């Protein structure tokens, strides 16, 4: 019934609408209304009636590749506007690079197309005829560094990877080659490859082959030449008119070259020009930039293990003898730190390099955080911790132990010590040696740690009052207790660590030096200077030079598990670990160890750091299950991530004044994703494309691909 009534209502409404339309039509026939004509005219307007400024703004959102080409076919007006939009896109990008006003875009899996294999030291170039970036060869990050000879095409309109199955004579698998564009051909030259694992001790193989690839025919061709350069890799090349100029490179057996070779791309013949004057040092891995038809810029390079160059040279290709000209580099301290493994690309009157960002300057983009270098001559001062939990802070504090290769702390071999029975045992703390961290990131302050005794709020307590004295030559087993922390959660327990094997070898007390008037931080009148501090850890003065080992996270975790098991049995177990303190009548503020021997107890002092004697990793392992080293934080916010930053070199005064200048940016937009080396940088239409590279193994980044990363750098809107 309900359905029938609804259908009837619908039929009535339809009839009413038809009658209304008919009446309106009759009224229009009888007496037309100018308002309806105006409304009909307004609905029939097209985009051609829009102001050109508005239409040009709308067209600026199109992709500068295929969408521009398609829009230009609509009409003459759109063709003219698209030309203006393309001009503004290019010059707007050049201005954005000069001012550092850029934005980053990353392409991570999954995205359309077959994912390309991770690689570095590959070759890449931009081919404008089909608006694509071609990638050839490279190495993979494996034990054997296997090389590839595959060719990939990135469609920049759809951002899709396509592997063309070409015919002809394929090149050998190699890396470190150069790929340049000449007319409708891609020219591949040089390269190297690792030897096979068997037989052993084979040298690397270098190539002097020339291959051309035709994208229109999908065909590889091998070019045979004579009297050419030796086999090389890591060289640089560029095309000017119908010549390919090749400079430098590695020749194998730790030999570098600074020769210049010219390949006639019409006759496929090699020649070596005469060059007068001083020349750059032999190098490889440099960048080669075309200034004009008669000038080439050489930037950076590597001449060997201890020869990393940051210089700049001009090669003048006159009609007579060619000549080298060294350039003055201004603001070198603001330049790219490593030019030999980070290629450069020209954008307008600037050269862009993407290299490692300075420590502590800016975080990763968009949400990765950088960390300063863990190597420091003077450890930073420890400050009291705020009430916020560490897991809620996006940036770790400086007093935390560094994460090296995905592990916390520093693992060192255990020293062997002689026991009274003659057997050798491993100890977490070896015998006397140079000062070194005992607990990475922990804090044992003079007011909270002492030998053989403890104050009321000290985290160091003796295991037993009947411990043998230092004069008898025995080691003292110091039990460390985890004191309650200010601002901690209510369910946090007072954990006392009494099973950590820290052996502090004490010298016998001298009977000639009295105890009266001595500082409370000394034992037997030795070591009058203040306590030493090693890597942010305060230790007793005579102990700082005697500790050379480090407590591993595994030992701390096992100790904490044992403490939890003992604390769960009741307060009696924890009370056995920390007996009540007593004072010897012979020396106030000290505890008796044996007859006639006293060890002073330090007075209560202000807590160093957050008042704990264990490093932060131990405290986190005590509060959280050891599932991840980044407890309570996203895995992509690793403290070992080194961000990549855009560096811009101004080359407008290169020929007139003989200088280049690194630009200084205060904007954080120039800092991008994690740093990669041996990647490629290619300029497209109003953007830069960064692909691949070798990421440091210490960078524990989960949300970014390691060596098949694809980034786009564009002007910020």
UniProtKB/Swiss-Prot annotation:
The keyword Repeat applies. It comes from the Eukaryota. InterPro entries: F-box-like_dom_sf (IPR036047), F-box_dom (IPR001810), F-box_only_SRC (IPR052821), Kelch-typ_b-propeller (IPR015915). Residues 1-30 have a biased composition (Acidic residues). GO terms for cellular component: SCF ubiquitin ligase complex. Residues 31-43 have a biased composition (Basic and acidic residues). The modification Phosphothreonine is found at residue 378. CDD domains: F-box_FBXO42. Residues 416-426, 455-469 have a biased composition (Polar residues). GO terms for molecular function: ubiquitin-like ligase-substrate adaptor activity. The keyword Phosphoprotein applies. Residues 363-376, 570-596 have a biased composition (Low complexity). Keywords: Kelch repeat, Phosphoprotein, Repeat, Ubl conjugation pathway. Component of some SCF complex, composed of CUL1, SKP1, RBX1 and FBXO42. Interacts (via the kelch domain) with p53/TP53; interaction is direct. PANTHER family: F-BOX ONLY PROTEIN 42. This is F-box only protein 42. It comes from Pongo abelii.
